[in-house]
C-alpha cells in the first residue's frame, strides 16, 4: 500500500460520518493467574487480578472507528438493565451519538465474560437475549433509519444474531442507503445470507462462508465456488472472505478477484478481528479509496488486532507503521514527534525495548555506523534524534552543517540499524526524550553518565544509560581537516 495515501485518509477521517447498526453487548474480561486445580472438580482455579469492561459486538466496530478518528453514530436496541446503562454511559464518554439506541423493557443486554490466565482464554460465559425485537420497538428503529441514513457516508451492519437485525430492519437499511448510493458493509452471521440482499459488500470469514455456501473451502477452486454461490444467491456485487493466516480474498461482480496475503505476525487472540476488518473497510470506502485498497488496509489492521488480547482497537499510527514496514524506504522511517510518540507507545505496550540516541551526524562515516549498530543491539528498536540545521548551527557554528537536515535524515534512515529518525529543533534532545520515553538512552564514550541529557528522566521510570566508545580517529572534524589539507596542497 502507498503510505502517503493511508496518511491522507486518516487526516480526513474526522470528516467521515459512519453509522453502525447491529447487536450491542459488553465484553467483560477477568485477568488472573492459575497454578492449582480445584479440590471440588477437575478444573483450574483462577485468582483474578484485574477486571475490565469493553464495548463488544457492534460496540467494538464503533470503537474501532473512533480510534481512527471517524464520527460515529450507533443504532441498536438494548435492555433497561445495568449492562444497558453501562453501554450508554461508555458511548457517551466517547462522544458517540446514542439517540438511535433504544431500550426495550424486559430485554436482556448481552454480556460475555472471558476468564484469561497466562495469555490464554480459559472459559467464556454468555448472558444474552436472542429474541427478535418486538413490533413497536422494531418500528421505532426502522423509522429512525429511514429518516437519518441519508446523512451518513457509510453504513456498517454488525450481525451477531442477537435479534436486533430483523429482516425488516435489514431491508430498511439496504433499501434506504442504496437509493442514496451510500455503501452498506455487512459482517454477516448464520447460513441464510439472502437477508443481506442489497448490501454493497459482505465480510464473512472462511468458516462463515462455508456455512453460507455449503462448500467446504479446501483450495483455490473451492474458495471460488463458495464465493460464486454466495454472490449469486444474494445478488451481491462484492464479497470479502477473510481467511486467517491465508489473508483475504476479494471477489467482485465484474469477475475480478484480488487475493491479499497476510503479514506474518504472532497471533494472541482473534476476538474482534472481524470488527476491525469491517471498520477499516468502511473508513477506506467512505474516505474515497477503491474497494481493493480498502480491503488491503483492513488486512493490515486485522494483522495488528490479532496480536492483541481481547476485543481491541487499532490506531492510525499503528497502521501507518505497519504499512511503512511493507515498504521500508527511508521516507517511511522519518517521523515527526507526535506520530513517533504513538508508534513508540504501542511498541512499549508489546514489551519491546526502545533505544534512543541523538546527534548531528554531519558527514556520515564508519565510526558513526559502528556506534549505531552497537546501539541497536541493546534493544528491539533504535530511534535517532537528529539535530535540525538551526540546532547544528547553534552548536557547531555558522559554517555547519555541511549536509542539510533533509539529506542527513534520509542518509540516516537508509541504515538498517535505525528504525526511526526524528528531527528536533532544540539544542538538546530532552523534550524529544520526554515525549518518546525510551527505556535505553545511548551516548558516545566521550560522555560521563552524569553528563548525558535525559539521564535522570529515563532512570526515573526504570530505564538506563549506556555509553558506547567511539572508533579512534573517526570524526567529522578529521574528515573536514583531511579534505582541506589535500585540496589546499593541490592548489
UniProtKB/Swiss-Prot annotation:
One MF term in the entry's GO annotations: ATP binding
Residues bound to ATP: 205-208
| Record-listed E.C. numbers | 2.7.1.167, 2.7.7.70
Q: Which pathway features in its UniProt record? A: Nucleotide-sugar biosynthesis; ADP-L-glycero-beta-D-manno-heptose biosynthesis; ADP-L-glycero-beta-D-manno-heptose from D-glycero-beta-D-manno-heptose 7-phosphate: step 1/4; Nucleotide-sugar biosynthesis; ADP-L-glycero-beta-D-manno-heptose biosynthesis; ADP-L-glycero-beta-D-manno-heptose from D-glycero-beta-D-manno-heptose 7-phosphate: step 3/4
Q: Which reaction does it catalyse?
A: D-glycero-beta-D-manno-heptose 7-phosphate + ATP = D-glycero-beta-D-manno-heptose 1,7-bisphosphate + ADP + H(+); D-glycero-beta-D-manno-heptose 1-phosphate + ATP + H(+) = ADP-D-glycero-beta-D-manno-heptose + diphosphate
Q: Where is this region: Cytidylyltransferase?
A: 356-491
For this UniProt record, give its keywords in alphabetical order, as a comma-separated list.
Answer: ATP-binding, Carbohydrate metabolism, Kinase, Multifunctional enzyme, Nucleotide-binding, Nucleotidyltransferase, Transferase
Q: Which GO terms describe its cellular component?
A: cytosol
Matches recorded under PANTHER family: BIFUNCTIONAL PROTEIN HLDE
| Assembly mode | Homodimer.
Q: What's this protein's name? A: Bifunctional protein HldE
* Species of the source: Trichlorobacter lovleyi (strain ATCC BAA-1151 / DSM 17278 / SZ)
The organism's taxonomy opens as: Bacteria, Pseudomonadati, Thermodesulfobacteriota, Desulfuromonadia, Geobacterales
Amino acid at each position: 500500500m502507498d503510505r502517503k495515501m493511508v496518511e491522507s485518509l486518516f487526516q480526513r477521517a474526522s470528516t467521515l460520518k459512519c453509522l453502525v447498526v447491529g447487536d450491542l453487548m459488553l465484553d467483560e474480561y477477568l485477568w488472573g493467574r492459575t497454578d492449582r486445580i480445584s479440590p471440588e472438580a477437575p478444573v483450574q482455579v483462577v485468582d483474578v487480578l484485574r477486571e475490565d469492561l469493553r464495548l463488544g459486538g457492534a460496540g467494538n466496530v464503533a470503537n474501532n472507528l473512533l480510534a481512527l478518528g471517524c464520527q460515529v453514530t450507533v443504532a441498536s436496541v438494548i435492555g433497561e438493565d445495568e449492562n444497558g446503562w453501562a453501554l450508554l454511559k461508555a458511548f457517551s464518554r466517547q462522544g458517540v451519538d446514542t439517540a438511535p439506541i433504544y431500550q426495550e423493557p424486559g430485554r436482556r443486554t448481552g454480556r460475555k465474560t472471558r476468564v484469561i490466565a497466562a495469555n490464554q482464554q480459559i472459559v467464556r460465559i454468555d448472558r444474552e437475549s436472542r429474541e427478535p425485537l418486538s413490533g413497536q420497538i422494531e418500528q421505532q428503529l426502522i423509522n429512525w433509519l429511514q429518516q437519518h441514513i441519508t446523512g451518513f457516508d457509510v453504513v456498517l451492519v454488525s450481525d451477531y444474531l442477537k435479534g436486533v437485525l430483523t429482516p425488516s430492519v435489514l431491508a430498511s437499511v439496504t433499501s434506504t442507503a442504496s437509493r442514496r448510493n451510500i455503501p452498506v458493509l455487512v459482517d454477516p452471521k448464520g447460513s441464510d445470507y439472502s437477508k443481506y440482499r442489497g448490501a454493497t459488500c459482505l465480510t464473512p470469514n472462511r468458516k462463515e462462508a462455508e456455512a453460507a455456501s455449503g462448500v467446504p473451502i479446501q483450495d483455490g477452486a473451492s474458495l471460488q465456488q463458495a464465493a460464486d454461490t454466495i454472490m449469486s444467491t444474494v445478488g451481491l456485487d462484492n464479497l470479502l472472505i477473510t481467511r486467517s493466516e491465508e489473508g483475504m480474498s476479494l471477489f467482485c461482480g465484474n469477475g475480478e478477484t484480488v487475493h491479499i496475503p497476510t503479514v506474518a505476525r504472532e497471533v494472541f487472540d482473534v476476538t474482534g478481528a472481524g470488527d476491525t476488518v469491517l471498520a477499516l473497510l468502511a473508513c477506506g470506502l467512505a474516505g474515497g479509496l477503491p474497494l481493493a485498497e480498502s480491503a488491503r488496509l483492513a488486512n493490515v489492521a486485522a494483522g495488528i488486532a490479532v496480536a492483541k488480547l481481547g476485543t481491541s482497537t487499532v490506531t492510525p499510527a499503528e497502521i501507518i507503521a505497519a504499512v511503512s514496514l511493507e515498504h521500508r524506504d527511508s521516507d517511511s522511517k522519518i517521523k515527526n514527534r507526535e506520530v513517533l510518540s504513538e508508534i513508540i507507545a504501542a511498541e512499549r505496550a508489546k514489551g519491546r525495548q526502545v533505544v534512543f540516541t541523538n546527534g548531528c551526524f554531519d558527514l556520515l562515516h564508519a565510526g558513526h555506523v559502528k556506534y549505531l549498530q552497537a546501539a541497536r543491539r541493546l534493544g528491539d528498536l533504535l530511534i535517532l534524534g537528529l539535530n535540525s540545521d538551526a540546532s547544528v548551527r547553534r552548536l557547531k557554528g555558522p559554517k555547519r552543517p555541511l549536509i542539510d537536515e533533509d539529506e542527513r535524515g534520509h542518509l540516516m534512515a537508509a541504515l538498517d540499524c535505525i528504525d526511526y529518525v526524528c528531527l528536533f529543533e532544540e539544542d538538546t534532545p530532552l523534550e524529544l526524550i520526554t515525549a518518546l520515553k525510551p527505556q535505553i538512552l545511548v551516548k558516545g564514550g566521550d560522555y560521563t553518565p552524569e553528563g548525558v541529557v535525559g539521564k535522570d528522566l529515563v532512570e526515573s521510570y526504570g530505564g538506563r544509560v549506556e555509553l558506547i566508545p567511539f572508533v579512534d580517529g573517526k570524526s567529522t572534524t578529521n574528515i573536514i581537516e583531511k579534505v582541506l589539507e589535500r585540496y589546499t596542497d593541490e592548489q
